[in-house]
Amino acid sequence: MESLGRGLASCALLLAVAVSIGAQPYDNDYTPTVDHPTFAKTTGPVVLIDEAHNNYHTCEGRYKVLCELLENDGFIVESSKSPLSAKSLKKADVLVIANALNAQNVTDDENWKTPILPAFTKDEIDAVEKWVAGGGSLLLISDHMPFPGAIADIASRFGVVWQNAFAFAADFNFAKAKGNPNMINFGLSADASGGIGHAHPIFQGRNAASVAQSVTSFTGSAFRLKPNSGVQPLLELGEGTMLLYPMASQEQTMQTPNASAVGLLQGAVLEQGEGRVAFMGEAAMFAARIAAFISPGFKMGMNNPDAPYNKQFTLNLFHWLSNNL
């Protein structure tokens, strides 16, 4: 751990950073159009959205736009409120787990406190691992603390060690945190925010029209890989990025433990058995929301003009997961 420094005043200032979640509805004015759908309407692969584990992102809520985007591309999108098992996964081609949480960690004020308990049972993790080996594809998404702690066990099964922390861009100004959106841009060239993208078909797309030159995240978390995991880095955190490790999500001060995030990841992919897995350390990049806690009307996700390729990156990601890329 290291000192916060980097422009903080000497007083014990509670950081007014852009990490407060609060009420963030989806953007009613944003329509996730797809000019050239990959599949005819309702004929594509089945995408199952996990909603059985107190998920912060669901098709009816914060992932409404994501689900609409996938449907507009021809995917069949279904929500599941059943425990993960061979039966519940049988018809799914892609399983999306986004910001799951153990019931004991759910709070009305969203000031989540440690310890963070697992969101999944061993039987559920076993079922998912077997399903992936047999050809299923998993998209595991975890925002900042507390969500990494809740999915640590299932991530570990696939060789990923998730940090129960908040990730910060290299150009984030802690002394002027209020109103700072903390956006990290991952392209194939160096970026002032500290994001480093790794070449992969998810960036390249199927043709020139589907290239995603970059993808932008909004805070989130980070993870490292176990030795010989076989996991391929996709979104890497570079020089100047850092992590904060609060004991309570909305209680961050100059004394909050912190560390460099250099070399850690916000995105990675894995081919295991007949299946595929993608790990993403930020959820809003796949959404389209309004984050008034940053500034009135602030657009967070694929609706943000400074994240022009997030929609295409999202489509490419699901094409890769469904073996259509």
Pin down the residues of each PLM region:
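Short, surface-exposed patches at the edges or C-terminal ends of soluble domains, predominantly
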Residues: 21-325
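Bacterial N-terminal signal peptides that target proteins for export
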Residues: 1-11
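Bacterial N-terminal signal peptides
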Residues: 10-18
